[in-house]
């Protein structure tokens, strides 16, 4: 379901992987339907008028946007929800969201946040990448192995913001919220061990993260983690079923109960 931010590389890898695995391929371009939604909402993407335009002319205009003008949450959410709408109207939706995204609220509410069953709900992002590489090297060979390794090495991005004129991607998840290897480390010690932020910072130093990041960078990412973890509870209070894998789970029905209006101030002051 290509949208305004879909890159040629990710679309190619998805298509080729399905071909190699013998799956049926069905492509639905969501740009026209999203454009009509913008019109219905009277929304001006990135402040651009839609009068007398088509989605193609809008895309051409968005390619010229400077980097500091490529921010529009409604533009992103419409695309994410359009994909979920199409999927749910056609069949049983298997969720793709993982534990890290759930912890950080890195999803669109009632879009990729929702499904009929979420198989990765307790698998952190770093483990997802490890498993893709493991399967590539131990279960497949040839083209499938090559494609899976390319997917694992692809910069993490929702690809919802418009591409530049040279079709380059301008949206990096880790560039926005920080490295997932730090977030997953924080998540484990915060939820599984109940560690205070000050102890988590100490443990991060013992884990040698200071070889890759400065103490200030680690502390900044931890603050981001805490703020987003508390702010995202309302999303975790409404999630589909899924299996528990490992020792950390954020299911509101089993392992994690938390009020959606909890205040992170006490935790933030402990750094």
Q: At which residue positions do the language-model features occur?
A:
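ATP/NTP-dependent adenylation/nucleotidyl-transfer catalytic domains that generate, transfer
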Residues: 1-271
């Amino acid at each position: 379901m290509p949208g305004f931010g879909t890159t040629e590389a990710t679309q190619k890898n998805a298509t080729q992987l399905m071909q190699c695995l013998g799956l049926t391929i069905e492509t639905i371009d969501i740009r026209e339907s999203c454009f009509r939604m913008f019109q219905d909402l009277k929304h001006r993407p990135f402040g651009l008028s839609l009068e007398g335009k088509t989605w193609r002319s809008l895309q051409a205009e968005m390619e010229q946007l400077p980097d500091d003008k490529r921010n529009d949450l409604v533009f992103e959410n419409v695309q994410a929800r359009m994909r979920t709408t199409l999927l749910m109207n056609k069949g049983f939706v298997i969720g793709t969201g993982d534990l890290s995204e759930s912890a950080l609220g890195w999803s669109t509410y009632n879009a990729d946040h929702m499904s009929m069953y979420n198989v990765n709900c307790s698998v952190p992002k770093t483990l997802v990448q490890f498993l893709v590489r493991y399967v590539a090297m131990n279960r497949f060979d040839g083209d499938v192995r090559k494609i899976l390794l390319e997917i694992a090495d692809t910069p993490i991005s929702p690809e919802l913001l418009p591409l530049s004129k040279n079709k380059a991607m301008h949206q990096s998840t880790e560039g926005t919220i920080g490295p997932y290897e730090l977030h997953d480390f924080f998540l484990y010690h915060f939820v599984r061990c109940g560690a205070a932020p000050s102890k988590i910072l100490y443990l991060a130093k013992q884990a040698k993260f200071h070889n890759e990041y400065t103490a200030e960078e680690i502390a900044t990412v931890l603050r981001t983690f805490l703020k987003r973890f508390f702010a995202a509870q309302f999303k975790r209070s409404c999630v589909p079923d899924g299996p528990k894998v490992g020792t950390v789970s954020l299911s509101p029905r089993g392992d994690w109960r938390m009020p959606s209006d909890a205040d992170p101030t006490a935790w933030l002051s402990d750094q």
